[in-house]
Curated annotation (Swiss-Prot):
This is Probable actinorhodin transporter. One of its GO terms (biological process) is response to antibiotic. Keywords: Antibiotic resistance, Cell membrane, Membrane, Transmembrane, Transmembrane helix, Transport. Promotes the efflux of actinorhodin. GO terms for molecular function: transmembrane transporter activity. Belongs to the major facilitator superfamily. EmrB family. It comes from Streptomyces coelicolor (strain ATCC BAA-471 / A3(2) / M145). One of its GO terms (cellular component) is plasma membrane. Disulfide bonds: none annotated. It is a multi-pass membrane protein. The chain crosses the membrane at residues 78-98, 109-129, 135-155, 170-190, 202-222, 232-252, 259-279, 306-326, 341-361, 369-389, 444-464, 546-566.
Length: 578
């Protein structure tokens, strides 16, 4: 379909207003603007399909990550990289993606992004090792950042002001449905192991959706680009990408390498490069050149506070979501499906919280409702950590549901208001750019959260392993003695158990069994069974303790977010039809 055909109203289905001549008079006799795009609602379905693909790609990985590592091998940092790879590329390239759409055409960039994203999903599904999967995830994130920003511009282009709110309102149910069903479908696919695909089928979900989105985009989306061709800040792009990479890489890899000097050198270098990025942007602004970020926005203290709240808040909640999924599967031994169903109340009540905010809380209470959402979320996290700490190995899904549900409700209230309040002091003509930067910071928070909280959690697993064995040593000795083990044999087995648990938590190859663990398997059958029970108890205790301590850090980050939120505007932006 040509651009001319795409822009011509379909007279059989178009509303009367769409059939008026472009330059003809309106109902009041004044000149009417161009008619709205006739296929706009069908085109909106294409844009929603792309959003769902992006959402699924994030939610399914939390469920599939343990199975990926078990199959491909590698250290625990593999789990971090297959998540960080996507979010880091998405965060860095998100603003650039919008600029490319303005320059080369939104439809063209949407189609290129959708084709590339779908192809990258297939690459993920056939990855032969963790390195290939991580590279494919980086590619996915970059192409997602090219595809997703075009939707905002296309919606503004296709819909008249009176329909814009309804168009954006369609995102809520679509995203809510994807958030609820995504993990459940992923858990089922991993457990079902259809045709021997296992976790690989999780990435193949995007194939039929991607094909439908691509075909729909070609047939339904209108052409369009910015009236004025924007400039592109290549140097700024290179600086921010290299700076963030230099910071994130040692955060993820430093722990398993024993925090060598090069890790700290790289982090210092990354910080220096980011300072250089700010200096470059200031210089470009003085010269009237292209900038990656509108620095005038950062001078608005309340908007800058919104960026700070988003960074700290999403650092806490994104890392928590991944680690909870790992704790359920690796720590407690839940199947992927059971883990996904256990976490479903999070998504369900998140949607409920967002609906409540949009219907009542946001307009009536403003920033107070946002603060309330943070308190409810922190309460849910507190309930979770107390439940995990008290129950340890005997934990059931139903015991976790109250904390997860309360946390999800608070999360929904918070994110339902954050963007509207953070953008309240931004001028109308700057809203698109400001929203793009805020979304990029949100994705950066996802990246930092997985890197920092993941490193903390995995570090705790190694450092407290010995204490976890010692906590259950008395019971283990009783069971070993009943199995016929002598005192000397008990001492040796417990010593090997301490080393085994520590090495299992910090080993760089999941396919290799540490020597200390093999020693445990060489005992007599009755003794080996008692030792295995002791290992499972210590293993679960180790994960539970690490999870509890990490959740305290999450609560601390929520407290920081609560304090920073006092700098936000008291009320959200009033809808003005843009």
């Amino acid at each position: 379909m040509s651009s001319v055909e795409a822009d011509e109203p379909d007279r059989a289905t178009a509303p009367p207003s769409a059939l008026l001549p472009e330059d003809g008079p309106g109902p009041d006799g004044t000149a009417a603007g161009p008619p709205p795009y006739a296929r706009r609602w069908a085109a909106l379905g294409v844009i929603l399909g792309a959003e769902i693909m992006d959402l699924l790609d994030g939610t399914v990985m939390n469920v599939a990550a343990p199975a990926v590592r078990a199959d491909l091998g590698g250290s625990l940092s593999v789990i971090q990289w297959i998540t960080v790879g996507y979010t880091l590329a998405f965060a860095v390239l998100l603003v650039v993606g919008g600029r490319l759409g303005d320059i080369y055409g939104r439809k063209r960039m949407f189609v290129v992004g959708a084709v590339g994203f779908t192809a990258a999903s297939v690459l993920c599904s056939v990855a032969a090792g963790p390195e290939m999967l991580t590279a494919a995830r980086f590619l996915q994130g970059g192409l997602g950042a090219l595809m997703i920003p075009q939707g905002l511009g296309l919606i503004k282009q296709m819909f008249p002001p009176k329909e814009t709110a309804a168009a954006f309102g369609a995102f809520g149910p679509a995203i809510g449905l994807g958030a609820v069903l995504g993990p459940i479908v992923a858990g089922f696919l991993v457990d079902a192991d259809l045709f021997g695909t296992g976790w690989r089928s999780v990435f193949l979900i995007n194939l039929p959706i991607g094909v439908a989105v691509i075909v729909g985009a070609v047939l339904l989306l209108p052409e369009g680009k910015a009236p004025v061709r924007p400039k592109f800040d290549v140097v700024g792009m290179a600086l921010v990408t290299s700076g963030l990479t230099l910071l994130i890489f040692p955060l993820v890899q430093g722990r398993e390498r024993g925090w060598p000097a090069w890790a700290f050198v790289l982090m210092l270098a990354g910080a220096a490069v980011l300072v250089g990025f700010v200096a470059h942007e200031l210089r470009q602004e003085r010269r009237g050149g292209a900038t990656l970020i509108e620095l005038s926005l950062l001078r608005r203290s309340r908007y800058a506070a919104g960026l700070a709240v988003a960074l700290v808040f999403f650092t806490g909640v994104s890392g928590m979501s991944l680690l909870l999924a790992l704790h359920l599967q690796i720590g407690l031994g839940f199947s992927p499906t059971r883990a996904a169903l256990t976490m479903t109340p999070w998504s369900v009540f998140l949607v409920v919280g967002a609906i409540l905010t949009g219907a009542v809380l946001g307009s009536k209470f403003g920033r107070k409702a946002l603060h309330g959402g943070l308190v409810v979320l922190a309460l849910g996290v507190l309930i979770m950590l107390l439940t995990i700490g008290d129950q340890a190995g005997g934990l059931t899904s139903w015991e976790l549901v109250p904390g997860i549900a309360v946390a999800g409700l608070g999360m929904g209230i918070m994110i339902g208001l954050l963007f509207d309040i953070a953008l309240a002091d931004v001028d109308k003509q700057e809203a698109g750019t400001a929203s793009g930067v805020l979304t990029a910071v949100q994705q950066l928070g996802f990246t930092v959260g997985v890197a920092v909280l993941g490193t903390l959690f995995f570090g705790l697993l190694g450092s407290q392993a010995t204490a976890s064995v010692d906590d259950g040593a008395s019971r283990a000795r009783t069971e070993l003695a009943a199995a016929g083990a002598s005192t000397t044999e008990q001492d040796r087995l417990l010593a090997d158990l301490r080393v085994c648990l520590r090495e299992s938590a910090s080993q760089q190859d999941s396919e290799r069994t540490p020597d200390s663990c093999r020693n445990l398997q060489q005992a007599r059958p009755a003794v080996a069974e008692a030792t295995a029970r002791a290992w499972r108890t210590a293993h679960t205790e180790n994960f539970s303790t690490a999870m509890v301590r990490t959740l305290w850090v999450v609560i601390a980050l929520l407290a920081v977010s609560f304090a920073l939120a006092f700098r936000l505007p008291p009320k959200p932006r009033e809808e003005e039809g843009f």
